[in-house]
Structures are given as C-alpha cells and as structure tokens.
Amino acid sequence: LFLHYMVLSWQIVRFQLKETFAIAYGNYTYREALIITLQKNESKGYGECTSIDYYHISLVDFEVILSKIKSQIEKQSIIHPTEFYAFLLQLDLPSFLRSALDCAYWDLFGKLEKKPFLELNKIDFTNLPESSITISVDTVENQIKKIEKSAWTKFKVKCNHFDEMDIIKLLQLDKSLALDSNGSFTKENCYWLENNEVVSKFAYLEQPMKPGSDNYKVLHTNKFANWMADEDCQSLSVLKKLQPHYRSINIKLVKCGGLTPAMEMIAIAKELNYKIMIGCMTESTIGISAGAALAPFCDYADLDGANLIANDIAKGSQIINGKIHLSESNGLGIKLR
C-alpha cells in the first residue's frame, strides 16, 4: 500500500519507575508519556513527550490539539525536516508537543532517505560526553551509599534544601558530581556556594533558585560555582541575558521544541561560549535516542531517563553505565519493542 501522505497516530503510555523519583518538586512512582507515530508506507518515525506537572503539561490537552491538526499534518508532503519544523511553528503548539512531532519527523525522514540522523546532519560523533545518572532527594548518607554502589562514573545529585555539611560530605567523595536543587536554594545559599572554593569541585550546579531574573541576577559566572540554567533557559531569546550569570545551560528537546531548534540553540550558545548539556525528562528510549543524537555537540550529558524506567517500550540509542551508544540505524534508529 503506497500512500501519498503521512499517517499521524498517538498513544499515552504509563512508565513505571524502577524506584521512586524524588526531586524538589515532589515524588513520582510513574510518568506518563505521549508517544507520536508518523508513518509513510512501511516507515515509521517516533517522538515522545512526558507529562510534567511543574511545567503544567497535560497530555490529554495535547490529544485534543493533535485531533485538531491531524489532517493538516497528514497533508504535508515529505519535505526537509527544517521545512516541516517551519510548518509546525505556524500551528502555534506547546513546545513539548512540537518537540515530539519534530523528533518523529526526523526519525521518519531518515528512514525514508535511508540515512541516520548523524549522517544527514554531518555530525562527527567521535567525541561523546558521558551521561550522569540522577540520585534522587534523600539523606546524604543514602545518596552516598547509592553513588558508591553504582557502576556509573558521573552523578547528578538532587536536593531540596541547602545544607553546608551535606555539601562537604558529598565533595569528600572522589567522584564526578553535579548538584541540582531544582530551584530550592536561597540567594544567601548561592552567595555561600559561589564564594567557596571547594564548590568548584562540582561539575556544575543546576538551577539553584526558582526561575526569573530577580533570582538569577545575584549569580556570577566569574566565581567558584559553575551555575547551569535549566528552567531559566527555555529558548534562544534568553541566552544573551543569562550570560553574566550562568556559565552553562541545560538544553532539553521538549523545552526548546525539538531537534531542529535545539541544533540552532546549540550553535548560538557555542558562539556565546556557554558550556552545554543535553538533558532529558524521565522518558523512554524514544526521547533519549533523540537527545543522544545531539550529545556530540555537548560538554555534558544527562540522558539517564530510560535507565530509570522499568517498562521501556523502544530500542535505539542506549546509555550503558553512562557510556552513550549511538544507534547507527536510519533516522534516530528507533524501533518499538
């Protein structure tokens, strides 16, 4: 059956987590994700976005939007993904949903062209950062036990309050650690952190305070802390403004709207001398395979999402004990299990 047009379908999937995921925003035992499929003839491309309450993301709302735009999307002929992205921009979609569609289209396009994403974009993938694994909010003793037992070598430690002694204990470990407080620190905490030389041992300190320039204006790039913007860095437009305050940024495909805008954002961030991390939500191999394709451009990677899920539904690029194994199959190399 040869079709002149694409077929768009979707489903909501519940991922059980291997263990409770505890961060400053709350505790989670599962995550729900919207999985998008774009099909032409025998080829299928896949994209994913996760339900995140602190970003006010409702997958049911997304389903309503998809029902409304289904026929417009299906009418598109196969054009270059950057042109498809320009079409998506006209639909005025939430960034999470635009990202799932953009990634699904890149995956489909590569499969139709019989070329991997890395080849389509002439990406040299000889140098890959190693991914961190997330250590949930817990007592510092339990966090240290988990770190010491792990086969991974890089760790992102989540915390929901500031404790000087905890920080000293963590830094006594001979491990590569980053600290992510998901906005739970105060200005005073940040002053202590950026003026304390021992803090330079952290690879980075992510989103120390709640987002907004009232908070981040007290952060300085020329002190000991390598501050990294997450919620403060949603799009290209803020990169210049964040420059005096954040040395590093966390780029997540769902935040910026997909692979297409992420590549543009990475290019501009590099010109502005930012250190760049490719990040993820708690997502399956579908979302992780898309993020991993941009790891060659980045200084840091936080792509452990699929490693936290008990019932992954796809195969593609893999993160094994932090090492990124990029799929060399066509598109993003995603196949459903």
Q: Residue ranges of each PLM-predicted region?
A:
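N-terminal capping/lid subdomain adjacent to the active-site entrance of alpha/beta enzymes
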Residues: 2-177, 182-191, 196, 315-337
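Catalytic core of soluble alpha/beta enzymes
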Residues: 157, 162-295, 310-322
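Active-site cofactor/co-catalyst pockets and adjacent glycine-rich loops in catalytic enzymes
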Residues: 306
